[in-house]
């Protein structure tokens, strides 16, 4: 990995989570259907909370998926890319349970969460201040709620479509709560790029990612077939629906309301005491 901005950069390391929407988004680059002369790309797939924590410790990957909640803790090393994000349009992570808790009731139970630095947890802490939580790997939350280890769980990824067939009830949809509070979409996760790579590499990578997303959207069946290996028990129509929720025209460009939503999310997190310091949101454009 280059250590200086002026170093010749031939290989770009990319890390993202092993879920169907990220796999779909990066398909163009991973399959080399999208190529950039003079550059090659390596891909590492790891769950989002691990990527959040790793980015906090060091700028190991050139480009990394992160939760927007993690950005305040990595902003010295990384800038947000203006594309490649997952945004909920009135929907998002959910608190689910085996029975229909009221909000007052669910405040008094321990909720399994997929990570301290996930955006899901940030919104949970704003919606239900002081609620007791415990970290559980995201793919174990539904099984552990079903087993009775936790009364409720905060689910992300494909669980948003599968909880009902497991007999669980949605207590609160964070995307709905956020939209009611702000009138804005809920920005969940994005991609960040090392600041020290410099503007020319930032611009190259922005275009490469847009081209990758664009390729997948134009060759949907091909890209979806690749994404199915990460779809966690979703059938093809459900995976297609899930991918459509989080990889779309807004993934190509957040738009002004999308960028405002990111700023508002992090500012509100600070105002409500969840994020300890003010956040400077800037994009590598």
Residue ranges and their predicted role:
Residues 197-268:
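Secondary-structure end/capping motifs
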Residues 8-31, 93-152, 156-158, 260:
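Bilobed "Venus flytrap"/periplasmic-binding protein-like clamshell domains
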Residues 34-45, 127-140, 275-281:
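A local structural motif
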Residues 47-49, 55-72, 137-138, 155-161:
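Beta->alpha turn/N-cap motifs
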Residues 12-13, 77-86, 110:
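A structural signal for short loop-to-beta-strand junctions that line the ligand-binding cleft
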Residues 82-103, 179-196:
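Hydrophobic/proline-rich hinge and linker segments of small-molecule sensing/allosteric domains
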Residues 55-57, 145-146, 205, 269:
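Hydrophobic residues within well-ordered alpha-helices
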Residues 139-229:
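Pocket-lining segment of extracytoplasmic ligand-binding domains
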């Amino acid at each position: 990995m280059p250590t200086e901005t002026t170093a010749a950069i031939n290989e770009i390391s990319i890390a993202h989570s092993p879920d169907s929407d990220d796999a779909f988004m990066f398909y163009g680059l991973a399959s080399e259907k999208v190529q950039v002369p003079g550059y090659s790309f390596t891909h590492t797939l790891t769950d989002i909370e691990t990527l959040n924590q790793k980015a906090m410790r060091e700028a190991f990957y050139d480009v990394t998926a992160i939760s927007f909640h993690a950005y305040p803790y990595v902003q010295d090393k990384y800038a947000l890319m203006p594309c490649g994000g997952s945004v909920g349009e009135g929907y998002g992570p959910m608190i689910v349970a085996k029975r229909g808790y009221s909000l007052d009731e669910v405040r008094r139970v321990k909720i399994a969460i997929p990570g301290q630095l996930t955006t899901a947890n940030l919104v949970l802490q704003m919606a239900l201040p002081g609620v007791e939580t415990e970290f559980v790997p995201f793919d174990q939350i539904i099984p552990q709620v079903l087993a009775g280890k936790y009364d409720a769980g905060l689910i992300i990824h494909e669980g948003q479509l599968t909880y009902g067939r497991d007999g669980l009830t949605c207590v609160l949809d964070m995307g709905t709560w956020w939209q009611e509070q702000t009138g804005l979409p809920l920005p969940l996760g994005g991609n960040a790029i090392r600041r020290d790579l410099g503007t020319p590499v930032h611009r190259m990578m922005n275009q490469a990612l847009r081209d990758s997303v664009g390729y997948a959207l134009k060759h949907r069946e091909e890209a979806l077939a690749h994404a199915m290996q990460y779809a966690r028990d979703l059938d093809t129509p459900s995976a297609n629906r899930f991918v459509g929720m989080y990889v779309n025209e807004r993934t190509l460009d957040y738009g002004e309301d999308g960028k405002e939503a990111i700023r508002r999310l992090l500012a509100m997190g600070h105002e409500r005491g969840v994020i300890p310091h003010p956040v400077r949101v800037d994009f590598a454009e």
